[in-house]
Design a protein with these regions (language model features):
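Alpha-helical cap/lid subdomain in secreted, periplasmic
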Residues: 31, 50-206
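Serine-esterase "nucleophile elbow" of acetyl-processing enzymes
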Residues: 1-42, 47, 51-60
């Protein structure tokens, strides 16, 4: 099947907030050679993103990359999963990648924060549920950034990075901690794009 473009749906993470202008859709376009449309809008919740995608019309010849839910719009995870399913169904494509949250599981200021216990590279409860639902279509952004994010950018892992990894947290070298503890910087978005690219290759999308 021919691919017209890759549509990246999401909020400020997709939009690229926290970087100096480089976004993960930018890097993904370079890696794939396929036109990528950045459809991230900062501050939007999952309901807003679902509505925008539905209004966009048919995307049957496109590949979807979706990350939503960090700003709410859902009461329980089952509802968020149904919203993902509805977005995909209305788009009319079976070619999609779901990015699970890149928030740290111990960050209680964010919607996904839930434990102070060290998670490491084990799945969080919500990553496990997403994996059950979406299977091979799920890209675990948090785990990928912990394992590969620094190496992709030629950055050296520090003792602090090791400690954060044991806790299940992404290196601060991939974030802009003076802004907040949820958004990424250019290095973080670059690594995220590489992970999406690898997942797309695995699925045979490019």
């Amino acid at each position: 099947m021919n691919t017209e473009e890759i549509n990246c749906w999401g909020d400020s993470i997709t939009e690229g907030y926290g970087s100096d202008g480089l976004t993960y859709p930018d890097v993904l376009e370079e890696l794939t050679g396929i036109p990528v449309r950045n459809l991230g809008v900062g501050g939007e919740d999952s309901v807003d993103i679902l509505k925008r995608s539905a209004a966009y019309g048919s995307q049957e010849e496109d590949i979807l990359v979706i990350q939503m839910g960090d700003n709410g719009g859902w009461i329980n995870l089952g509802q968020l999963i149904r919203q993902y399913r509805k977005l995909i169904s209305k788009a009319g494509t079976d070619r999609y990648i779901i990015i699970s949250s890149t928030d740290d599981p111990n960050d209680f200021e964010q919607i996904w924060g839930y434990t102070t216990e060290p998670v490491g590279l084990e799945n969080t409860w919500y990553e496990e549920e997403f994996e059950k639902e979406f299977g091979e279509h799920l890209f675990n952004g948090r785990k990928y950034l912990i394992e590969h994010g620094l190496q992709i950018n030629g950055l050296r892992r520090t003792e602090t990075d090791y400690m954060r990894a044991k806790s299940g947290c992404i290196s601060l070298q991939l974030r802009n901690p003076w802004i907040d503890n949820t958004h990424l910087n250019e290095a973080g978005y670059t690594a995220l794009a590489h992970g999406v690219y690898e997942k797309g290759k695995e699925l045979g999308y490019w």
